[in-house]
């Protein structure tokens, strides 16, 4: 993993709440391998937003800003990457 991805991973997994870590960090782990430069930049921008906003966009309780609409947000909204204890 290159330096940029390591930094994104750290930022994704150290958000401030366990719930945000699981959602945003889990999303990173599930999807980062397929990202090019554009997706990396978009994810880096997304990480500058508050956890409350990101989580609200992901679960659909707030509208997603136009700048984040697209395949990455569609994948985040699926929430199929979060490990749930059984």
Where are these regions (language model features)?
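Positively charged, polar, low-complexity stretches
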Residues: 2-86
């Amino acid at each position: 993993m290159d330096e940029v991805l390591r930094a994104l991973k750290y930022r994704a997994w150290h958000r401030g709440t366990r719930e945000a870590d699981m959602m945003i960090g889990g999303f990173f782990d599930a999807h980062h391998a397929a990202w090019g430069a554009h997706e990396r930049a978009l994810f880096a921008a997304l990480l500058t937003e508050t956890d409350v906003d990101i989580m609200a966009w992901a679960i659909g309780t707030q509208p997603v800003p136009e700048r984040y609409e697209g395949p990455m947000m569609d994948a985040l909204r699926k929430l199929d990457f979060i490990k749930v204890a059984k």
